[in-house]
Amino acid sequence: MFDILMYLFENYVHSEVEFLVDEDELTQELTRAGFHQSEIIKALSWLENLAELQEGDKPYLCNHAQHSFRIYTQDEMDKLDVECRGFILFLEQIEVLNVVTREMVIDRIMELDESALILEDLKWVVLMVLFNAPGNESAYEQMEDLIFEQPDGRLHS
């Protein structure tokens, strides 16, 4: 399923191609690209649920103290190792994520089929969430820089 999400993000969203495609057409294209029907359905459902998070009717997306500390459940810790949880905290500290977008990221991660997530995959989920969260354009650009900038090995310029 994650491969399909990456395919869609790279071919439609990130390439700035107009994303006004009929779901049936999209399913056919993904099938032609070699993806299995069951995985396509899961990926499209994942994206639909991401869009629904914008409505903010989930209790964990409302009424948070701005400087609250996130305690992860055991299931979340099983899926997100220490490195991934640390990266989420880092993103909050540099204000790429706020309380709401952090919870959206965790929600979407928990819906992925993967039993554990690697840091690179987490970065892409964050980018997908920020892209779909209105008002987070600056955070999206900052996250894009974190993903695509390659360190040149110098500590000082």
Curated annotation (Swiss-Prot):
Matching InterPro entries: Smg
UniProt cross-references to Pfam families, sorted A to Z: DUF494
Family indicated by similarity: Belongs to the Smg family.
Protein name: Protein Smg homolog
Organism: Shewanella woodyi (strain ATCC 51908 / MS32)
